[in-house]
Amino acid sequence: MAEGGRPGSGPSFRSNHRKILNLLLERETSFSMSSDRPGTPLKKKLFGDSANLSILSGGTPKRCLDLSNLSSGEMSATQFTTSADLDETGHLDSTGSEEIQLAGMSYHQHLLKCSPAQLLCSTPNALDHGRRKKDAICSSSENKENENNTSKPLEWWAHRNLLFQKRPGGPYMSPLSLLDNGNLVEGEMKHLGSPITAVSKLDKNPERGEDQAEEISDELMEFSLEDQEEAKVSLNTSCLYRSFSLPDSLNSPGLKQVVKFKDHTLPDKVKKKYCSSHEELRKGLGVKKMVSLCNINMIQMLEEDSNQGPLIGDFSKVCALPTVSGRHQDLKYVNPETVAALLSGKFQGLIEKFYIIDCRYPYEYLGGHIQGALNLYSQEELCNFFLKKPIIPLDTQKRIIVVFHCEFSSERGPRMCRSLREEDRALNQYPALYYPELYILKGGYRDFFPEYMELCEPQSYCPMHHQDHKAELLRCRSQNKAWEGERQLQEQIALLVKDVSP
């Protein structure tokens, strides 16, 4: 029968035909990511080198859209490649169908050249829709082994949003081909109903009015639950079957959205009040200094001490005389004005008795001194006068004040003041003192005399390095050194005795 009949009518032909059908079905369902798919001999004979249409897009493998039904909303691309009468061997009939096929192929290739990349859709919805269509075709074609539709080129069913449209004066064109290259991705995402494109549009125009921004946000948030589920499924599918032509940012998971219904809307007054209260709350929040109770108490004590003045030597009272800063930080200084006020009796309510100690040498003291001042230039004389028989005030509320000075109050006066304080500390238990208030006249007799000459006796001034008193100066200095040496020796002996005693 194989010899008398037409070629390929025997069992061998059927087995070969079944292998071709299985090969086509395997290629259809495998969905390989390679962009270079080898064409079958049948495709090469039908379409030539243009059978591999996925090379035109440079992305994932793609197939021709089905343009079979223009009027009903879906059309198959095989209308342009009109199905020719194939013989049982899969070859074209040499009758008039060749001209129809060539004309259809040329028109089909013309459409592909107009929009090669846009015609090959790669959206996730199109993949899902096309896959369902192809499963139906494959199931129906399993029982039709010997029919000619097994040799038809593979069809890709497009999404209904990507149908071809006919312009007034031109052929059928894809709506994606009307977009420019920059708006291609936005167009595809718009058909998907994805919120990503809408968010980017809001970012491009940040200076919109409040009303317009609210309208746009309402439109974005008014998604139904069904549309949200479709968007989630499509975005999850795009992670597996994403076209290389799409940017990587679209491969990221979708943004979370809150369903907002039309009936549940806030009035404008409530929104404005909420915004104003939120802004006031943010303004009220700020960095504030935290102060503990202990810090407050210490600060108050320091402020009180600074306002009241420094304390006296036994820390029991505040100094009766106003003090100023001087050369030695451990001593308290007073101005010539304060000493003049002390002499005039302005502090009688606080002071029972005061002493002005002139620490200069005798010839300086005789040359001019402050009224009522005592000339004590050696430490022995000072200790004998104040410590042998300490002076105690009769009124416990009043005080006894001692003011030291020399020519400039730089060396001799401060040294005598420290000597008296040391001896007083040694004789009393800390912090008790016989003479807690000791002062230094700032500037000495040199500054006091020009301003208050009437308070000096005699009203003259004799400097330490006077030409007429050089010999007396040497004698006083040697005497002071001897007294100083004797005092240091006595101190060392006292320390040794203290260490030896049990």
From Swiss-Prot:
**Region Disordered: what ranges?**
126-150
Q: How does it assemble?
A: Interacts with MAPK14 and 14-3-3 proteins. When phosphorylated on Ser-122 and/or Thr-123, interacts with PLK1. Interacts with MARK3/C-TAK1.
Family membership? Belongs to the MPI phosphatase family.
Q: Which EC numbers does the record give?
A: 3.1.3.48
Instruction: Give the species.
Output: Sus scrofa (Pig)
Query: Do you know which Pfam families this protein is assigned to?
Result: Rhodanese
The active site annotation covers C406
**Where is it mainly found?**
nucleus
The record describes its post-translational modification as:
Phosphorylated by CHEK1 and MAPK14 at Ser-245. This phosphorylation creates a binding site for 14-3-3 protein and inhibits the phosphatase. Phosphorylated by PLK4. Phosphorylated by PLK1, leading to activate the phosphatase activity. Phosphorylation by PLK3 at Ser-217 promotes nuclear translocation. Ser-224 is a minor phosphorylation site. Phosphorylation by CDK1 occurs at G2 and G2-M transition and leads to increased activity.
GO MF annotation: an example: protein tyrosine phosphatase activity
Check the record and name the CDD domains matching this protein.
Answer: Cdc25 (cd01530)
Domain Rhodanese: residue ranges: 350-457
Instruction: Point out residues bearing the modification Phosphothreonine.
Output: T40, T60, T123
- List the GO cellular component terms: cytoplasm; nucleus
Q: Which PANTHER family match?
A: M-PHASE INDUCER PHOSPHATASE 3, M-PHASE INDUCER PHOSPHATASE DUAL SPECIFICITY PHOSPHATASE CDC25
InterPro entries the record matches: MPI_Phosphatase, Rhodanese-like_dom, Rhodanese-like_dom_sf
Identification of the protein by name: M-phase inducer phosphatase 3
SMART domains in the cross-refs: RHOD
Which keywords, in A-to-Z order, does the entry hold?
Answer: Cell cycle, Cell division, Hydrolase, Mitosis, Nucleus, Phosphoprotein, Protein phosphatase
